[in-house]
From Swiss-Prot:
Active site: D326 (proton acceptor)
Major localization listed first in the record, in broad terms: cytoplasm
GO MF annotation list: 3-phosphoshikimate 1-carboxyvinyltransferase activity
Annotated Gene Ontology cellular component terms: cytoplasm
Binding site for 3-phosphoshikimate: K29, S30, R34, S176, Q178, D326, K353
Superkingdom classification of source: Bacteria
Top class in the EC scheme: transferase
Span of the signal peptide: none
Name of the molecule in the record: 3-phosphoshikimate 1-carboxyvinyltransferase
Binding partners and assembly: Monomer.
Role this protein plays: Catalyzes the transfer of the enolpyruvyl moiety of phosphoenolpyruvate (PEP) to the 5-hydroxyl of shikimate-3-phosphate (S3P) to produce enolpyruvyl shikimate-3-phosphate and inorganic phosphate.
Family: Belongs to the EPSP synthase family.
Any single Pfam family the record assigns to this protein: EPSP_synthase
Amino acid sequence: MLTTASSADILTLSPARGLRGQVSIPGDKSISHRALMLGSLAEGETVIHGLSLGEDPRSTAACFRALGADIPELNSECVRIQGVGLDRLQEPAEVLDAGNSGTTLRLMLGILAGQAGRFFAVTGDRSLRSRPMGRVVEPLRQMGANIWGRAGGNLAPLAVQGGSLKGIHYHSPVASAQVKSCLLLAGLLAEGTTQVTEPALSRDHSERMLRAFGAEISVDVAAKTVAVVGGSRLVGQTVQVPGDISSAAFWLVAASIVPESELLLQDVGLNPTRTGVLQVLQEMGADIQVEKRREVAGEPLGDLRVRSARLRGCSIAGDLIPTLIDEIPVLAVAAAFAEGTTVIRDAAELRVKESDRLAAIAQELSRMGAQVTEYPDGLEIKGGIPLQGAEVDSHADHRIAMSLMVAALAAQGSTTLRGADCARISYPDFIPTLQRLINPSSAS
């Protein structure tokens, strides 16, 4: 049973006795951002089906409306965008507000840096203003960008004076799709070729979509390098956004740890740079089958059937981390219910997300009785200890909020979650969907 307090931000959850039904997974947030951006930069019309309606893509749409793109009110059925062309964004009179979305802000910086003769100011909410922007600002400056801001340009608000850019070969110290995508977008407007080499390959939605829109882009998998040639002309396309595997992950873990559960998750994106969560859960013993594999608009997808299972601990580290970075909080929940010990390393990137996700999930699971050891770059979780309902907090982070809701479903006793409403950032219908799926026999 779920009970919402009058503030609508405090949620009380009781243990569930079974999750059953079908779930239509909301559109992939990463792909939605990129479709909105490239549709705005393309010539002609771009049609997007299945767009995510979370707050983050709405922030992207609002920013690009202010930059001159014709973007109607968002819906998940069909959104038609009239683009303005690659280098013809208008200078807005207002500050561009990315809200809580690091993807919006970081990728937009790459686009704005090459808009010669125009000035832009960008900011975000309190959380985003505390997150590091130097990881994209520094390589953009190497390309010739003029960007200023707090802490030497590491923190928003930031000011951008658009100008001429030159291609560079950048060796990123972290495997980050946001860094890579920012520089590829800047490279579209730069003279020559822009190359990005990563320590491990991050998600490749930008490369796939840029190629579909007409950019001259190449990928050297062995060298972990992506290159884009400046001066490409982008042409509007039809984009079908698959379901977000990061959103599906909450249901995969929930159905695995709540007894007598069986869920069918429909139309989930199965891009190989994103499916680490499936690999890890199956290694832990989860009962997950992929059905109806297919490819739509260059992205693989399928349906996922998941049933309750006994999980066991495992090791999560190395090149696997970029393929499941957003799913680590809910995988920590799975680890707490698994027999044995789970060790997560090489995940220091989680400390600079919407919250310090390593610290947040360690703190809140510990409140529920889990044995969690925190490392600078990861966690060690000793599973098999029954979790107890407790008062927990989302840390204003949507992925922490939904992970704790999943933990509450299999804990003993009721759990009260503060800050539940932030789930809307990426998954507006998560709580109503959860209520629908809970077996009626669990109601009290």
